[in-house]
Swiss-Prot record:
This is Early E3 20.5 kDa glycoprotein. Keywords: Early protein, Glycoprotein. Glycans are attached at N73, N137. It comes from the Viruses. The keyword Zinc does not apply. InterPro entries: Adeno_E3_CR1, Adeno_E3_CR2. It holds the Pfam family Adeno_E3_CR2. The keyword Glycoprotein applies. E3 proteins seem to be dispensable for virus growth in tissue culture cells. They are potentially important for virus growth under special conditions; E3 region may help adenoviruses to evade the immune surveillance of the host. Belongs to the adenoviridae E3_20 family.
């Protein structure tokens, strides 16, 4: 789970400078183009850091064709960040929804292919930072083992030893008295 999150966040860090900002009026339809090759997986990134796959959501609000994501009849709920990746290349969009009466400002688009050379060192440093964050957020092993844990482990070990000794005792006693039949296996009716 952590590796998937690190992959998604590091991919987002790699395309931060290649983000396309789109201003879309309410009620329109917008198509986000994904990378050219391969099957594209689309993610929606929420302000609280959560992720969702719009193509997997029920309803007819989002339409996916394997490469492009089409958002139909946009409302203010669809405003936010959308990220498409084929796990080799990726594109990132910031959709800003404006009222239908407001004229849309000029669209500024940055190509992710032109930003690749400059983002490689930044991506590497971002990935290292993400790995450090993931390791620091994980629960560190305590230096001392709690007494309750020691008690539980001791009880389990003692129980297993008692069961083992009972089995050994039964096996040894049964061999000494071979003429005796096993009462549990004797089915004389």
């Amino acid at each position: 789970m952590i590796s998937t999150t690190i992959f998604i966040i590091s991919s987002l860090a790699a395309v931060t400078y290649g983000r396309s900002h789109l201003t879309v009026p309410v009620g329109s339809t917008c198509t986000l183009q994904g990378p050219q090759q391969g099957y594209v997986t689309w993610w929606r990134i929420y302000d609280n850091g959560g992720f969702a796959r719009p193509c997997d959501q029920p309803g007819t609000k989002f339409s996916c064709n394997g490469r492009d994501l089409t958002i139909i009849n946009i409302t203010s709920n669809e405003q936010g960040f959308y990220y498409g990746t084929n796990y080799k290349d990726s594109l990132d969009y910031n959709i800003i929804v404006v009222p239908a009466t407001t004229s849309a400002p000029r669209k500024t688009t940055f190509s992710s292919s032109s930003a690749k050379a400059s983002t490689i060192p930044k991506t590497a440093s971002a990935m290292l930072k993400l790995q450090k964050i993931a390791l620091s957020n994980s629960t560190a092993a305590p230096k001392t083992i709690p007494k309750s844990t020691i008690g539980i482990i001791t009880a389990v070990v003692v129980g297993l030893i008692i069961i083992f000794l009972c089995i050994m005792y039964y096996a040894c006693c049964y061999r000494k008295h071979e003429q005796k039949g096993d009462a549990l296996l004797n089915f004389d009716i």
